Amino acid sequence: MIKEILEKTGALMEGHFILSSGKHSSRYVQCARLFEFPEYGDVVGEELAKLLKKYDVETVVGPAMGGVILSYVVARYLKARSLFAERENGVMKLRRGFFVKPGEKVAVVEDVVTTGGSVKEVIELLKEYGANVVCVGSIIDRSGGKVDFGVPFESLLKLDLPVYDPEDCPLCKQGIPAEKPGSRGLK
């Protein structure tokens, strides 16, 4: 069902992409396209919330941009608070008056996990506040099982999409121009 929603909304894209991790791929998942259609965003959020319900989550936090809408929709179904972390001078922060209390049970959610870099940054940020990060959830896991967050990781769909280091990218070797659709904005 999730893959069909991604295809129907145009979220599953083909081409030559530079991922937020810096790696290259011939396929890209742009979940912002999925969230153009609130009815599909609701389906995805509810399904992910069902996976995370067993963790007794009090607050759901997503990294901007991919986790902003997702954290809201998942939190609504879990009857939890929804926050997002965003970059300030290249560093993940809780801004806009957001906070977590020491010991608060938090789920971190992200639309797509490849290397898990943004999620790991959010987990470290939340630990600085003393939060108890109990799980991570994503719509898509394209890590190939290589990511360890130190807490349970739940995803709605595992996609084995090709990922290349830039120096090994066959698309670069063919001279195909690359597009950088991500939003990580690292310095």
Swiss-Prot record:
Coiled coil: none annotated. Pathway: Pyrimidine metabolism; UMP biosynthesis via de novo pathway; UMP from orotate: step 1/2. The keyword Glycosyltransferase applies. InterPro entries: OPRT, Orotate_PRibTrfase_bac, PRibTrfase_dom, PRTase-like. 5-phospho-alpha-D-ribose 1-diphosphate binds at E110, D111, V112, V113, T114, T115, G116, G117, S118. Its cofactor is Mg(2+). Homodimer. This is Orotate phosphoribosyltransferase. The gene is pyrE.
